[in-house]
Regions:
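Alpha-helix N-cap/helix-initiation motif
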Residues: 7-10, 17, 182, 221
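Iron-sulfur cluster-binding electron-transfer modules in prokaryotic oxidoreductases
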Residues: 80-411
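Short, glycine/acidic-rich beta->alpha junctions
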Residues: 6-10, 66, 223-224, 359
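Short, intrinsically disordered, charge-biased short linear motifs at domain edges
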Residues: 3-15, 50-61, 193-196, 325-329
Length: 411
C-alpha cells in the first residue's frame, strides 16, 4: 500500500498477514463458552478472503463482544477485532439496527430524560415487574446490570464549584458514565488531582460515540466523536494533558475512532489523541518524575484488581496496579482473567446476557474466593458487571487513592 492508504484500508490489508495459527481463537473469551461463535479468525480474516463484490458478514459475528483480545494476542499484527467491528457494522446496515440497540447506544440521552425523575426511574429499574417488561418489550435482560441515574450530573456540580488556583493544569475528560451515573467518581478524581497540585479544567463535553459504534451506528458515532474532539482539541493544542477515567472512552479517542470510523484525517481527533492519558497512567508518570504526593495513609483492605480488556489497546501496561502498590496496608490480588464479559452494552442484551456471565465466571469466582470487601477495575461497565455478579462493591482505583490521601468522601 502507498502512503495515501486510509487506516481502514490498512486494517483490512492486515488480514493478509493471517497464517491461521488460531492463537486468537484460543484466546477468545466468547468462543470458549459458546459453540455458536466459531471464533474471531473464522468470522473475520478467514472468511474475508472469500468475500468479493461487497461485504457479506457471517451472522455469527453478532456474538462477538468486541473485547479486542484477538488483536492484542495476534503475533502477526492482524487487526482482527477491527476487521470484525467493520463487518458487524456492515451486517447491521444490511439487517437494520433494533430499537433496543438504538436506545442502549445513547446512555446520555436516557440519563438526561430520567434525571428530573431519577428516584422514580431508579425505583422502576429495581422493580422485577418493570425489568421483566423491559426484557419482553425491548430485549434488555431482566437481570442485566443497569446503573442508577444520578439526580444531578457531574457537569452541574462542576459549574457550581469554585476551582482551585494551582500552578499546573490538566483537562478532565470524564465520559458519560461519570457525568450521568457516577458523579461521585468525578468529584474524587478532581480532588486527587488537586491534591497533587493540579488545576483541573472540565470543559463541556458529550459522548465519545463508542456505544453507537459498538451497536453498528457508525454515522452517528462519527458525529459524536467529532463533536467531542472539537471541544477538547483547543486544550490539546495549547499543550495541556487530558486525563480520562473511562478506559474504553479514552481508547475510542486514541485509536478506535481512527481505525474503525475512518477518522484518521480529523485534525481535532489527532490533536486530542496525542495529549490523552488514562488517569492512572498520568499519575504514575508523575510518580516516576518524583511529582506525585506520597502522603498516603494505610488502607487495610484485600482488593482484587481486574484490568479491563480495553486497557490492552492503550499499550500502557497496568498503571493502576503500580499506583495501588504505593498504598500502605493494601493487599492487592491481581486478576489474570482476560474478560468480565460485559463488553459495554453487549452483556445487557437478552440473547447475550448468559454468554457474558459465562465469560466472566472465572473472574467472579476469583473475587468471591478472595473473601474481599471490595474489588477494583478501571472500566465503568466492568465495575457494574463485577458488582452485579459477585455482590462485591467494585471501585475505580482513584477511589482507593482518594481514601489513602485522607480526603473527605463526597456527600
Amino acid at each position: 500500500m502507498d502512503g495515501t492508504a486510509t487506516i481502514e484500508e490498512l486494517v483490512r490489508g492486515s488480514l493478509d498477514r493471517c497464517v491461521k495459527c488460531t492463537i486468537c481463537e484460543t484466546a477468545c473469551p466468547v468462543a470458549a463458552v459458546t459453540p455458536l461463535f466459531p471464533g474471531p479468525k473464522y468470522a473475520g480474516p478467514q472468511l474475508e478472503r472469500f468475500r468479493t463484490g461487497g461485504p457479506s458478514p457471517d451472522r455469527s459475528l453478532d456474538l462477538c463482544s468486541g473485547c479486542g483480545i484477538c488483536t492484542h494476542v495476534c503475533p502477526h499484527g492482524v487487526k482482527v477485532a477491527e476487521i470484525n467491528a467493520l463487518a458487524r457494522a456492515a451486517m447491521k446496515a444490511q439487517r437494520g439496527v433494533p430499537l433496543r440497540d438504538r436506545i442502549v447506544a445513547r446512555p446520555a440521552t436516557s440519563a438526561r430524560l430520567a434525571r428530573p425523575v431519577a428516584p422514580l426511574a431508579n425505583a422502576l429499574l429495581a422493580a422485577g415487574w418493570f425489568r421483566a417488561l423491559l426484557e419482553r418489550s425491548l430485549g434488555i435482560h431482566r437481570r442485566a446490570p443497569l446503573p442508577p441515574f444520578a439526580g444531578r450530573s457531574f457537569q452541574a456540580w462542576v459549574r457550581r464549584r469554585r476551582p482551585r488556583a494551582l500552578p499546573r493544569a490538566v483537562v478532565y475528560f470524564h465520559g458519560c458514565s461519570t457525568n450521568h451515573f457516577e458523579p461521585r467518581l468525578g468529584r474524587m478524581t478532581l480532588e486527587v488531582l488537586e491534591h497533587n497540585g493540579l488545576h483541573v479544567a472540565v470543559p463541556p463535553q458529550g459522548c465519545c460515540g463508542l456505544p453507537l459504534q459498538s451497536n453498528g451506528l457508525l454515522g452517528a458515532a462519527r458525529r459524536y466523536v467529532r463533536g467531542l474532539a472539537a471541544r477538547l482539541a483547543p486544550y490539546a493544542r495549547r499543550g495541556y494533558p487530558i486525563v480520562a477515567t473511562s478506559t474504553s472512552c479514552a481508547l475510542m479517542l486514541k485509536r478506535e475512532a481512527m481505525e474503525i470510523l475512518g477518522l484518521e484525517d480529523d485534525p481535532d481527533l489527532r490533536a486530542v489523541s496525542e495529549r490523552l492519558y488514562d488517569v492512572c497512567e498520568f499519575l504514575l508518570l508523575l510518580h516516576e518524575r518524583g511529582e506525585l504526593r506520597t502522603d498516603l495513609r494505610p488502607v487495610e483492605l484485600t482488593l482484587p484488581y481486574h484490568a479491563p480488556c480495553q486497557q490492552r489497546g492503550h499499550g500502557i501496561g497496568k498503571p493502576a496496579l503500580e499506583l495501588l502498590s504505593l498504598v500502605p496496608g493494601l493487599r492487592v490480588v491481581e486478576s489474570d482473567v482476560e474478560c468480565c464479559g460485559i463488553a459495554g452494552t453487549y452483556g445487557v442484551k437478552r440473547e447475550k446476557y448468559d454468554v457474558a456471565m459465562a465469560v466472566g465466571e472465572p473472574l467472579f469466582r476469583l473475587i468471591r474466593d478472595a473473601g474481599a470487601d471490595a474489588a477494583a477495575c478501571d472500566s465503568e461497565t466492568c465495575r457494574w458487571q463485577i458488582a452485579h455478579a459477585t455482590g462485591v462493591p467494585t471501585l475505580h482505583p482513584i477511589e482507593i487513592l482518594h481514601r489513602a490521601y485522607g480526603l473527605a468522601p463526597p456527600a
